[in-house]
């Protein structure tokens, strides 16, 4: 989810970010590369499974064919082959190398990252991981931004609440269900929260996944709403009593900032990039059942500390804009051209 938002937001702002008064204008061409069988729209088609397993030499040749002779080429995911010059690549995280239930990494990706003219990492944490595990030298750290829709988000309308079944007071977990999301701990923590806050529900949104279903289906006070229409997501966040992010490992943690932008307090694990993104504007907890339960119970108490957390969160989210991120990307693009 975060990687897709990143691609759309940076691509939308690339031309404006590269515009410098008095200098020749840049032309931005966007290649939306899809597999041959993908039903999604795209202006380039490749046999992606074969490209992913191709030799390093073959991938370089494919890159020459795919990108042409631009001054800089920004690969926004590691599946795409490298450019022959001006090669920029983004690392959102290195989970493919660390977690067996994630998609396996492209065989040549680590070497291609080391050979790239520039590597952009979305957090200091990811940059340190890329250096330590992949041997990437001098990565550029450029934080993600927050979609403006979350700053202006109104709570869900009554008909949308009824359609989703979410009610008035709920804790929201939004995103994937891979092992690093730590849903087992959230499932272990929830009964203690439910006993203490019986009027509160746990709402879990995200694409269907057997782990999420196994852990939460039929659990008292828990509700699986599946993949929510994108137009409803800001309202779903804004209507929440709090957002919980118990992950063991995140390359950035965009749901933290989206909640803060929508004036919703956050409980997040004190792991990976989450403290870097949240700053002092979230309740940071150990990623254990006891830690998560205590954090959720605390954030749902009616006291001035929670109100202060909401104000601090809003201010924190305002520091992360896609305009700033795009300008910093443009500096990297110019540096390799």
Label for each model-derived stretch:
Residues 1-337:
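Carbohydrate transferase catalytic cores enriched for Leloir-type hexosyltransferases
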